[in-house]
Amino acid sequence: MRAVTWALDLLFPPRCPACDRRTERVALCADCTSAITPARSPLCPVCGESFPGGGPDHRCTRCLIRPPHFARARACALYRSDHPSPLVEALHRFKYGRDVTLAPLLSAYLDEHCPLSIDHDLLIPVPLDLARLRWRGFNQAAMLARFVAVRRGRRFDAMLLQRRRATPPQVGLGESERRRNVARAFAVRDRSAVRNRTILLVDDVMTTGATVEECARTLHSAGARRVDVLVLARAADA
């Protein structure tokens, strides 16, 4: 088996999924790892929006005007649309390049840099519609959530929250358009499995939060006691 591994490494040497530099294993290289911007205080204690400069955590204007249905949303890292993070570059290869070999790397990063205490009754991924699921072949959020659930010894259900209809991609839409786009797009398959439970909703990225907010609203309508949100990366300029 070691000979096979050695031969594969010789023919297909491991490379950093962000910059394509050769590495000892499938992992972000040291330069790309150091270029990731962690999501740190000061931030909104509700949605996790990051604020520039110093000062204490405080609620953002968005959460003051329209309190979300989730209790907390947190990201492991931040990125800007004009300066993509190496973590997002790797995520795009996983998600759009359908490179499932990156699932363990990204899932481990999510678990190891998780800013939340994971004591929830249930971990649920943001679901894909059937057309996207068939095209991609997997739900990236489900792969991330399952890895964290197994590692933390928590229950995981990829089928409990479902999309009732296909929605156009959120990319390029404004905040109000994003909310309308996903309005009533989700449903809970078994309300008894959600009732009075604490739920951690997992996704890959968060921009304005419209999708996770609609998911949280749907879960609360089904009787969930509390919904938190965990994502790999969050847009710092949404």
Question: What residue ranges belong to the model's regions?
Answer:
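Glycine-rich phosphate/pyrophosphate-handling loop used in enzymes and phosphotransfer proteins
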Residues: 1-238
